[in-house]
Every structure is written in C-alpha cells, then in structure tokens.
C-alpha cells in the first residue's frame, strides 16, 4: 500500500497479525497489560505499541524503537495475513489527509486506478480508526483516540493517560503514531454553521 503514491507515509505503517501468538516473534516483551488488552479487545480496533525486536526493519517502524501492532477484526483480513505466512506491515487503505475507509465503496473511490485489485471483506464495524495505545513505557498512553475509549481502557488497566502531544501540537515532537501531528482524517464535505 505504501507504493500507491507519495501521499502515504512510512511512519503510518501498522503491523497486522492474524493471531495473538504472532506478536511474540515481533516484540521484546508482552507484559500483563498487553495480555489483558489483547484478550479483551483483539481481534478488534485496538493497536498496541510495543518495544520492537530487531526483526522489525526501521522502514516499518519509522526509525523508532517501537512497533505498532493490531489484529484486525475482519476475518478475510486475518485469513489473508495467515495465507501470507508473515505479518503484514501496511497503513490504512486511504490517501493521507482523508478519513480511513469504512465501506468497500470508499476504498474503490480512493484507490481506483492506483491498485490492481481490492479484496472486499465487508463494511467496518466501527466508523473511526483504531485506538492506538503505547505500552512501551510504564504509564500506558493513548496516542490516537478511536472506538476503544480512554474509559474502556481504564476499566481494564486502571491508569491510562492521553499522550501530551494530543493536548499540545508541538512540531518539534516526533510522532509516535499515525494521525498525531499531521493533517489527517479530513472529510471532503461542506459544513455550514
């Protein structure tokens, strides 16, 4: 997907796995917090940031020492990953600056003429991107809000906070996740107030 056009950024790649067990080969440590979240929300719209193992190339992690991993809820996506025999590192199937697609027709509209084929698994269960939570540090931090809310995460983990960059858009802070600093998720609609 990164080859579709210059609109997609390498730092926006998430590693998608078919099974929870696949994560063990990719990350340094899966602590109790990660196990609780994986058991509660996977497969589903939760991306977890871990300290990566050396097997994860810098071009996948954007040069960071962490990697963002999710297990999609869509069975067709998980079957495709399983058939590939390896996790798949890819961004959302959208053009940067546009919302991520939630229906097959959104992908067809955005990607028409840019890709050779589109595998349709059906519409998404949620209308927003996955929540991204960073577990690479002692305090769990939400890097990108999504359909799994701060409150839902707090019920499982106890203390969870929002990353300071979500509260203060400092251009000198390196983004840890897609959509934290850049123009992102902008619908093409006229709005009247």
Indicate residue ranges for each PLM-predicted region.
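Active-site-adjacent structural elements in enzyme catalytic cores
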Residues: 6-193
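Extracellular interaction modules
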Residues: 1-5
């Amino acid at each position: 997907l990164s080859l579709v056009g210059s609109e997609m950024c390498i730092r926006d790649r998430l590693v998608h796995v078919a099974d929870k067990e696949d994560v063990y080969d990719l990350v340094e440590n899966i602590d109790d917090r990660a196990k609780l979240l994986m058991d509660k929300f996977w497969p589903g719209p939760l991306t977890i940031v871990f300290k990566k193992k050396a097997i994860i190339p810098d071009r996948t992690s954007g040069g960071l020492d962490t990697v963002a991993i999710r297990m999609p809820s869509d069975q067709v996506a998980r079957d495709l990953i399983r058939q590939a025999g390896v996790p798949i590192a890819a961004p959302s199937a959208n053009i940067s600056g546009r919302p991520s697609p939630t229906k097959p027709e959104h992908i067809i509209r955005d990607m028409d003429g840019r890709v050779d084929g589109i595998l349709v698994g059906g519409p998404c269960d949620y209308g927003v991107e996955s929540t991204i939570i960073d577990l690479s540090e002692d305090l769990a931090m939400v890097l990108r809000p999504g359909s799994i809310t701060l409150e839902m995460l707090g019920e499982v983990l106890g203390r969870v906070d929002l990353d300071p960059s979500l509260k203060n858009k400092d251009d000198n802070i390196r983004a840890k996740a897609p959509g934290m600093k850049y123009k992102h998720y902008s619908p093409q609609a006229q709005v009247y107030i």
